[in-house]
Amino acid sequence: MCDMLDNKLGNRLRVDFSNISKQIEIPNLLQLQKKSFDYFLNLDNGESGIEKVFKSIFPIHDPQNRLSLEYVSSEIGKPKYTIRECMERGLTYSVNLKMKIRLTLHEKDEKTGEKVGVKDIKEQEIYIREIPLMTDRVSFIINGVERVVVNQLHRSPGVIFKEEESSTVANKLVYTAQIIPDRGSWLYFEYDAKDVLYVRINKRRKVPVTMLFRALGYKKQDIIKLFYPIQTIHVKKDKFLTEFNPNDFMDRIEYDIKDEKGKIVHQAGKRLTKKKAEQLIKDGLKWIEYPVEILLNRYLANPIIDKESGEVLFDSLTLLDESKLAKIKEQKSFDIANDLANGVDAAIINSFAQDGETLKLLKQSENIDDENDLAAIRIYKVMRPGEPVVKDAAKAFVNDLFFNPERYDLTKVGRMKMNHKLGLEVPEYVTVLTNEDIIKTAKYLIKVKNGKGHIDDRDHLGNRRIRSIGELLANELHLGLAKMQKAIRDKFTSLNADLDKVMPYDLINPKMITTTIIEFFTGGQLSQFMDQTNPLSEVTHKRRLSALGEGGLVKERAGFEVRDVHATHYGRICPVETPEGQNIGLINTLSTYAKVNELGFVEAPYRKVVNGKVTNEVVYLTATQEEGLFIAPASTKVDAKGNIVEEFVEARQDGETILARREEVQLIDLCSGMVVGVAASLIPFLEHDDANRALMGSNMQRQAVPLLTASAPIVGTGMEQIIARDAWEAVKAKRGGVVEKVDNKSIFILGEDDKGPFIDHYTMEKNLRTNQNTNYIQHPIVKKGDIVKAGQIIADGPSMDQGELAIGKNALIAFMPWNGYNYEDAIVVSERIIREDTFTSVHIYEKEIEARELKDGIEEITKDIPNVKEEDVAHLDESGIAKIGTHIKPGMILVGKVSPKGEVKPTPEERLLRAIFGEKAGHVVNKSLYATASLEGVVVDVKIFTKKGYEKDDRAIKSYDKEKMALEKEHHDRLLMMDREEMLRVCALLSKAPLNSDQKIGDKNYKKGQTADISELEKINRFTLTTLIKAYSKEIQKEYDDLKNHFQNEKKKLKAEHDEKLEILEKDDILPSGVIKLVKVYIATKRKLKVGDKMAGRHGNKGIVSTIVPEVDMPYLPNGKSVDIALNPLGVPSRMNIGQILESHLGLIGLRLGDQIQEIFDRRQKDFLKELRAKMLEICSIPRLASEKEFIKSLSDEELLNYARDWSKGVKFATPVFEGVNIEEFSKLFEMAKIDMDGKTELYDGRTGEKIAERVHVGCMYMLKLHHLVDEKVHARSTGPYSLVTQQPVGGKALFGGQRFGEMEVWALEAYGAAHTLREMLTIKSDDVEGRFSAYKALTKGENVPATGIPETFFVLTNELKSLALDVEIFDKDEDNE
């Protein structure tokens, strides 16, 4: 813990119970997205993602080779507006991309058509507008809305071998291989039921694999030699002999091995061992007899040619039978394909048999003899059926499919995976397929089929990689450019003779690129509305990994295996945090310490172990790199020198847990918490919770609403400050220095670097609305004079307390039933919590209204609204907008607006009368913005945007003046501070140097050689200084000039900053066409805890507030303190989240120890500081490492007091996940806090004052209020809108709909026999149009409700039947039924 405090990230001390001291800091939680986007935009000065994409598309040539378009360079502009401006004005925070394009016109030789030289070169800069820019908080502002692009977890390109059960043949396994590129055609190799090897391209019809090899230019013999060992058979004295090669006989042999004399040297059915084989060779065995029965059914590897006539007797791949063998005996020797060798089968031979027929037919139809050309034509016909084909086009097509970098891209990752799997040595820059890749893949598949190869696991993290924002954007850019490339090629073909006049701009349409990118950000599945409920939800949203999205899985078709936790997730992907529901397992989160390497594979950190000794060297490994290694868990016992204590260690190897000798262990986990993600590592005692409940706990922490006053948990895990460190909500000091001035809105820090003094200014944001309508507010946590280090948190954001995440409140809880009110997880709450605003939160809602230009005139924002009472507009200002501070109730006018009525042209007389009497009211309609039914609160801000060319109203002018004044004041403050600092430095400089002449300074006279008093120097003004400085030496004068110049430069910088801010303020508002004014009103609503609100702990223990009980009626402790919350004890055993019990024990200990520290404060004896320090040291000495002891000893008295004051409200603990407090430590703590060992206490009933029969578990638990607020859900309707077709009330709160009375509810009333109620439900309360109208009329007049009519549903049914051409007539029962 101590090492964390040295960084001064937080300003709080926690008693840390870690077993292992931290080796490395937790890496920045958002670094993956930052690095990825920086790479894309070339901010790291390497070859960027943008450059790569442009170079992959350009140059573009026209078909006649007369013109070529080349990419020269690109330059990135600066954003036009700030982030805040973009959010307020509804714009996209983006930059323009300037692309330099060169168009070259070539000279051509008229006769040959060859390029001779360059005729003309034109260069032009082309602007690509609006490339969204990542904000410093790792999000994007698109149309004023903050969005996040989540990382995609997809299948890595490369080759993968699979084994699946056959869908057609029972109990048969089918083996397949796939070559997956990042871009281009997929290649599938598969066996069929008859053991023929086929290939498919892009899931088209399959062709025998040999067809593909032939299309690649291989001859029959070449293919046989590539796939089969060639065995030469010699003919001697009517015997077939072959060389003895032990490798061919390693398995059990089905025939006797005889030497050339016919003597049996090894019997059939016995295994030939290596030793025996060596002995046979030693004994001089060279030739053995090849049995004729085996030779039958073998195939020739090479054609057999008659030596005399030169005629081909038998072609290669001829199946040998007795008659053929008889003819072959005349030859001295011949070659056969040994398909009985180890690791091969007859698949290729079978494929040849299959493709022979096809080629014969093609030969006849195409009149081509070359088999390679025919194979290319066959593949072309499969890929493009029905199209005419020429052999050259077919060959070019096959070549384009896999060997053209424009069409096919394996990427660096794919090439690495291919090389690794197939043992190739192709250079990594070759990202297209090679012939060797295809051949080796087929060979390896045959090996796999014959039990020699290794089948891949597609869920292994070595076969899945992460595509982060940079790569996703590069892919989108490539798509846009590819569209543009096609358009340019089309334009090239339509160009006429005057090529000299063509400019790059005529050919390139940058809109194609922009639309593709903006489409990705607005409509892509991976670009999501940022979850901004609290800092944790924001951080975890940016660390999310999704298997969905373009090029990923489809959630309806994803099976169980993909969703399951895999052994390789250990330390890489959190096994706990994933949504409940249909996305479970498809959306994951990175583990806390995980990193992603440049190839997109997730790495986990380990410490190296050498000869049983743990070193301090930390290595990051991918799932592939850690294969086969023995890894010990972090909880392994290690002595002080780092040696592993026990001889046998429980270690992991390839996902299996085994006992390994300590010398065999190569790695050890960095720490126990590396397994889980950020949200799960915030749950104390996670190791005691059931995984399902932990999942709910981590998901619900993300829904916790920021409360009015944040307070950090008493029982934390130490992760709270890490999240605050990396969340942008907190303000962090860019550079170190001293706090010069602090107020509610700004912090000024004065510091000094190599160049000299500087002043940094930080502003606090107040009352901003987040995406989830929660309130975003910052407040300083430093005081004037504090020394601040770079990176230190100087202001808390929402849900933060002293630089720590604080998403809930510590509450005193009792596990006990309370009159049945906490039945089924309901929660009983004390009124004190509501009175003290413990769980009160502020929510901000934005309402906007536009004034448009219509054909009848312009709409006007005004207070002058027709047919509205004076008191209804009393709260509006002169401009017709609600004043700031107005209390808004449902139905009140927020902004007054009138719209012109379309009317007949008035006569001249009417116009004159109107001009005299100003009779305007009758010709406008009230179109004001009203507060909705559930909206109640206070107006906190108003933003007005006016289109250029239209007059600004008073309110807009006032707000502009106010903002300008604030900027001026801030600038003035900074200049004053600079001046003061400059004078201090100058006075300090002059007070140390002797005078060169007699001088009068202030009221004193000084002789030459004396030094002036600093107090006198401070009294004189600047003008006197300029003359006084001449009385000093040249060195001093130079130092003075340097100082003066430095401060002048700093002031110039401040002026430039100020001018830039003013310029932004004065920019014209950009509004959509037709809109002349836009008004946004922000209303803050205070939401107190109510019955129906959802609350939860951190262990998945959630519930609804069922009742709020007066404080006096709640159960109370012997000391008179009443309990805050009563929870149902039955919610614990079946849920198995015991962590909450331990948390409440430790929380109570924290409170009791805090009381003891408070007592020391209250006594205030002579040496109470000594007593305080002793008490704090006693508490800190309980954990195993006791790392805070040294820290407390080193604190000054003032610092100690600060920490002690914080502890007096409850001693704060950090119990990291999987390293929690153990039994011995708990018993020491119970003893110190003077609590019974069972953690239970006597309680008294608040209403009767009687002692409750059993002792009750009382503790302190951290409770959260979730954003499922009852105020936003309660809704009622009497009459309202109806659905057009069915005439039934619409559904949902948003549409002001009714409650659905469905099928099952109807059954309930039928079963109950409530006929009249049922009739009412199905008619006048639903879709009996006339009936409901007459019922309403009758009720308003106080008459009886008339009889009901026919529901509209009946007419819908009859009309449906009529639409099917059925004549439907309705007869009344009174009519005679003829």
UniProtKB/Swiss-Prot annotation:
It catalyses: RNA(n) + a ribonucleoside 5'-triphosphate = RNA(n+1) + diphosphate. It comes from the Bacteria. Its EC number is 2.7.7.6. One of its GO terms (biological process) is DNA-templated transcription. GO terms for cellular component: DNA-directed RNA polymerase complex. GO terms for molecular function: DNA binding; DNA-directed RNA polymerase activity; ribonucleoside binding. Signal peptide: none annotated. Coiled coil: none annotated. Keywords: DNA-directed RNA polymerase, Nucleotidyltransferase, Transcription, Transferase. PANTHER family: DNA-DIRECTED RNA POLYMERASE I SUBUNIT 2 (PTHR20856). Belongs to the RNA polymerase beta chain family. The RNAP catalytic core consists of 2 alpha, 1 beta, 1 beta' and 1 omega subunit. When a sigma factor is associated with the core the holoenzyme is formed, which can initiate transcription. HAMAP family: RNApol_bact_RpoB. DNA-dependent RNA polymerase catalyzes the transcription of DNA into RNA using the four ribonucleoside triphosphates as substrates. This is DNA-directed RNA polymerase subunit beta. It comes from Campylobacter jejuni subsp. jejuni serotype O:23/36 (strain 81-176). The lineage of its organism: Bacteria, Pseudomonadati, Campylobacterota, Epsilonproteobacteria, Campylobacterales. The gene is rpoB.
